[in-house]
Amino acid sequence: MKSRSYKIWMIIVVACIAFSPPAGGDASGPQWLAAVYQSIRGKLNDGAADIPLYVRSDEHEGVFNAEVYGIVDYSVRVLVDALTIPASWCESTTLHPNIKHCTYELQDDSVLFTFYLARSRKPLQSLQHAYELKLKFRVLALSKDYFKVLFEGNEGSMDTRNHRFQLEAIPVADSAFVRVKFSYQSRLMSRLATTIYLGTFSPNRIGFSMVGIDNDGQPIYVKGNKGLLERHVVRSYLAVIAFMHTRDVPAEDRFEAQMNRWYDLAERYVLQLHEMERHEYIEVKRQERDKLRPLQAPVAVRGMHRGDKG
């Protein structure tokens, strides 16, 4: 891999971009993703941005979707080598403040991940105090020109279902254009629980997509469920980036580097993502890692490679 600077300048594209998935399902695939890139490339190149972001969300009949698009300073092949290894996903996802622990086990045609979630700023002392989210991981496309992985599960915490998390990428020169999307179906109890949570703990928290302009000419950002989901998907995206940036750090120092890198990236979006100071975040993650890491049983697997790698 080429030696590159790890200094990243990010922008959020708030202009309205004219691309939409066709009716009847989620759009994806190399041709569709290439068309999206052509639609937004001018905006993505505004300013000194090595990894610019475009974030959008929507809700239809109780299904919430949020996705982030960006340019990452790695080839698709480098992403393939890193992100087809199940352990890589446990390393990266647990950088997210609300993802406390992760385990995985092999199944016939997939890997079953269990993510342990909690909305607490304190270290998780026991898995009994966390919500479990079980997602099957599959590699759907694997070549030098297109890469796609999917996590999916039928049931989630707080009466949610049909959880889907996907990452796909196409080459753009020596880099990759990446889409990360998260979606789930909300039911009555989950909507009620989220409404209570937002009203109690984060009534003024905002997301990334702009929904208007106030009387002073300042942007108005989305709030509520869509704002919550946008914050989640951007945190997850930044976790992947932080993991990639620290892959070459010696093993004994990598965890500390990952945490600090994730925090650096998240603090670029202080209005949306700031929840605790650096030392608080790092101490929580250290304690959770030391206490919960032994729960992962050894798994003899290096990657989930399909046969169409090019």
Label the predicted regions.
Residues 2-10:
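Bacterial N-terminal signal peptides that target proteins for export
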Residues 26-48, 52-54, 154-156, 162, ...:
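Terminal "cap-and-tail" regions of soluble proteins that handle hydrophobic small molecules
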Residues 70, 102, 131-140, 164-171:
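Hydrophobic/aromatic beta-strand elements that line small-molecule binding cavities or substrate pockets
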Residues 72-76, 119-123, 137-143, 153-157, ...:
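Beta-strand elements of well-folded, non-transmembrane domains
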Residues 18-22:
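N-terminal signal peptide c-region/cleavage motif recognized by signal peptidases
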Residues 54-82, 103-104, 221-228:
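Terminal, regulation- and interaction-focused segments at domain boundaries
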Residues 73-97:
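Amphipathic alpha-helical segments
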Residues 88-130:
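Short beta-edge strand/loop motif at the mouth of beta-sheet-based domains
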